[in-house]
Amino acid sequence: MSEAALVPPALSTNQTEETFNFQQYELLRQDRAAHLGPGITDLASLKERIRSYYAIESLADHLNSHAEYRSITLQFPDDLLFDSALVAEELQALLPDLQCARTDAPAQADTTCSCGTQKTCADSKDSADGRKIWILADTAYSPCCVDEVAAEHVQADVVVHFGDTCLNPVETLPVVYIFGEPYLDRAKVISLFTERYDKDAKVCLMANAPYSRHLESLSGELSQLGYSNLVFTDVALPDTPNAAATILGVSDSHPISHKLYASGDRVYYGAKEQLLCEEQLQSFELFHIGLPPDPRLLFLSTKFQGVTAYDTQKRQIAKGPFPAMMRRYRFMHVARTASTIGILVNTLSLKSTRSLISSLVELIRSCGKKHYMFVVGKPNVAKLANFEPVDVWCVLGCGHGGIVLDHANEFYKPIVTPYELTLALAPELSWTGAWVVDFNTVIDGISADLGLQAGAIPAENVPEFDAVTGKYVGNSRPLRELNHLEIESPQESITTGSTELVKKFSGALTIGSTVSTSAQFLQARQWTGLGSDFNAEDSYEEEGATVEEGLSGVARGYQYDVSNAEHTDADVPKTSGRVMNT
């Protein structure tokens, strides 16, 4: 047999090296007009706008002044992720020792280093000791928070956070915040503002962190048009900041304005020198530039008389739907009569997360309720639907964008905040309409509630009225009389079966004066498993299972479905007449 006969036939068409070349990523095709503005025609103008928007030079100077920052992580939100490669490239050009560390292969003694210098990589620092840049994509939790979990995977020394942020204090890593310099159509904003408000209206100008740089000049232009009752806000680190937090590219000086009030990460300024308080803000309308996340929007709706949001992407007033406070009040009533509470941890980087978890667990136990704890990155409907025994969820997340509000009614079980849970578990449910998202404030409130419950006389095991269903619930506090299970059974009472105790307690809902919510939930299910270890009379065959015919057909119409449909059609009386297709 010849060698030609041993060659297998070709199973595909002719392929060359060009066939396997990946499609090149075209930078100019991305629509960056929303944040970089119009006028980008070539790669040079794009890089110049990138350097200005992300304050690359200021960032490089800050990193060069901290030689201890060797592993640098850049965190981008999803809407700015396509700029990450250009930002890393421009930053590398200003960090000389970093390029030597990223050399793909060791250079020879007679060659030039890939960084462009005349020194060889053999004479420079080892690549393991040089600086490295990492890009953090697909953050574990809300993009406004610093992703310490992802940064620890690469042993980061510093996190550079770009875009909108909540400025919540983090536990360990130093943080550098760069909001950016987004483009704003000022003429469009002023036109929509004048159409909506009268000149004597009391309006507060607020924006997401990147757009806050436009508020002072925008307030000055509106004042020239006759609006005299205006205040605006600017971003600032909270009163209890992280000592290693730094904001670059933002000036905190306002020479022509007066500081009126400070609350959280916002400082209020105005042209008139007067003092404001939280009660006086209730008389102001809020004009917000940029569509804030739902938790932030709900929080602002409790602080001002009304909220109007300007969508910077569509360049129009956002029309909703917006989250409502009435749904929060209903969810609190559900949590009041819930027997099992799921603590959903939606952040691990906030400074008071662990303290809040401990306080919530202590509060839930003191109220006689069961709890489970879950750590889920970016919770969705499918993830939480796997835990049916949970009656209500308590989400621990950032108040800016880490709280799941479910205003579209997609989740199977209600989701409440720690503050709402503390109100629901109080002896008397009373709510002033305030919506607190600060962890430290909630912890102080839980400590006060535990102090009141310690001196109170425990109530008897009486049913509790459910305001949602209008019925009485008898097992809302299953651990109210928590006793350890002690079983004493004499040897002579034990039969030959080794599962006698299981038989005795398998159908019981109360064991040792303690309500078993798991047993109650299991008995309420239509399907309880593939079989029983102790019930010998329940479809048990010693010689083996009988082979039975299973389902047949496709998923859209199994055989028994087809039979039922035919049977139903046969029962429907037929009518005479002609059907016209329109």
From Swiss-Prot:
InterPro entries in the record: DHP2, DPH1/DPH2, DPH1/DPH2_1, DPH1/DPH2_3
Entry's Gene Ontology cellular component terms: 2-(3-amino-3-carboxypropyl)histidine synthase complex; cytoplasm
Residues at which [4Fe-4S] cluster binds: 145, 166, 398
Keyword Cytoplasm: yes
Cofactor(s) demanded: [4Fe-4S] cluster
Entry note: cofactor: Binds 1 [4Fe-4S] cluster per subunit. The cluster facilitates the reduction of the catalytic iron-sulfur cluster in the DPH1 subunit.
Quaternary state and interactors: Component of the 2-(3-amino-3-carboxypropyl)histidine synthase complex composed of DPH1, DPH2, DPH3 and a NADH-dependent reductase, predominantly CBR1.
Family per record: Belongs to the DPH1/DPH2 family. DPH2 subfamily.
UniProt name for this protein: 2-(3-amino-3-carboxypropyl)histidine synthase subunit 2
Organism whose genome encodes this protein: Eremothecium gossypii (strain ATCC 10895 / CBS 109.51 / FGSC 9923 / NRRL Y-1056)
Gene from which the chain derives: DPH2
